[in-house]
Amino acid sequence: MIVLFVDFDYFFAQVEEILNPSLKGKPVVVCVYSGRTKDSGAVATSNYEARKLGIKAGMPIIKAKEIGKDAVFLPMRKEVYQQVSRRVMNIISGYGDKLEIASIDEAYLDITRRVKDFDEAKELARKLKAEVLEKERLRVTVGIGPNKVVAKIIADMNKPDGLGIIYPEEVKDFLYNLDISKVPGVGKITEEILRKVGINRLGDVINKSGELVNLVGKSKANYLLSLANNTYHDPVESREITHRGRYVTLPENTRDLNRILPSLKRSIEEAYSKVDGIPMEIYVVAIMEDLDIVSKGKSFKFGVSQDRALSVAQELLNKILESDKRKLRRVGVRLGKITKSSTLEDFLH
């Protein structure tokens, strides 16, 4: 298998630069304003000039303005970015047989049948980058690998406007020696848990396989072990984004369940209003007072109805509050694996 991972570099900010060339060379910060106060909210993304100042995604806007006094702060224009994303994804799809859209600015592409080897894949990736730049003026980074995760990792290492490749014979050593923080899906909390027991490189999980499930759960343990043993081969699946979410800013930072539940209920109602089908997964997502993100989820064989969603979400919220002592700033739900119910009997089961 030969997979490309395409990452639209600092996407929202880059689109703003394309639409307004006078922004080029200036620190540009695209923000999500919460509406509490004039500068309440968080940074969605920033260009590399802003990042050099220390401004990064998730940072409170008020702090970003203290750091970047001369930076240009812009509100997020999601509809504009979605239009550009659709056009770019259409270009990318022409270079492979299966396109898996991971997010508004990331995609996996299976090119196994389009090229005879990895050197030819590199040439194809160059052509893809050139066409996107010519038609949309957008710079993207491409990673090439024998599976999705390796392709993503090498892309992350070659930003911005880069092209990275890992050949099959290099994968085993590359993954074994990879710093655990570089593994997709390993966040700050998981990283801390793993480092405490001496897991600093991905290869270290092999010697800790017996205790790994207790540390990070069965699903993540299996994922990490399959990567470390070079047996990860999840295919690229032809699909667009199959989740819907809605997040609400709380009136004030709090841990009080009674103050959080009305906002959680509202986010459920709005998320379900956008769904055309039955979600098989539900996640509660909490943005903490320091803008760290914590989530808990649950899967259902036959889906979860809106009527049932609130009780499930409350259960997941309780788990977050029990495991984390910080106050919540925002709360919401994400509905995943949205599908059509085969029969009414299945859905009501």
UniProtKB/Swiss-Prot annotation:
Binding site for Mg(2+): D7, D105
Single Gene Ontology MF annotation: magnesium ion binding
Cellular localisation: Cytoplasm
Catalytic activity annotation: DNA(n) + a 2'-deoxyribonucleoside 5'-triphosphate = DNA(n+1) + diphosphate
Record's keyword annotation contains Metal-binding: yes
SUPFAM superfamilies linked to this entry: DNA/RNA polymerases (SSF56672), Lesion bypass DNA polymerase (Y-family), little finger domain (SSF100879)
Keywords: Cytoplasm, DNA damage, DNA repair, DNA replication, DNA-binding, DNA-directed DNA polymerase, Magnesium, Metal-binding, Mutator protein, Nucleotidyltransferase, Transferase
UmuC domain boundaries: 3-187
Gene Ontology process terms (BP): DNA-templated DNA replication; error-prone translesion synthesis
Active site: E106
Gene Ontology terms: cellular component: cytoplasm
Sites marked Substrate discrimination: F12
Record carries keyword DNA repair: yes
Matching Pfam families: IMS (PF00817), IMS_HHH (PF11798)
The protein's required cofactors: Mg(2+)
Top EC class of this enzyme: transferase
UniProt-listed Enzyme Commission number(s): 2.7.7.7
Entry's cofactor comment: Binds 2 magnesium ions per subunit.
Function comment: Poorly processive, error-prone DNA polymerase involved in untargeted mutagenesis. Copies undamaged DNA at stalled replication forks, which arise in vivo from mismatched or misaligned primer ends. These misaligned primers can be extended by PolIV. Exhibits no 3'-5' exonuclease (proofreading) activity. May be involved in translesional synthesis.
Family: Belongs to the DNA polymerase type-Y family.
Subunit structure of this chain's protein: Monomer.
Protein name per UniProt: DNA polymerase IV
Organism lineage: Archaea, Thermoproteota, Thermoprotei, Sulfolobales, Sulfolobaceae
Gene: dbh
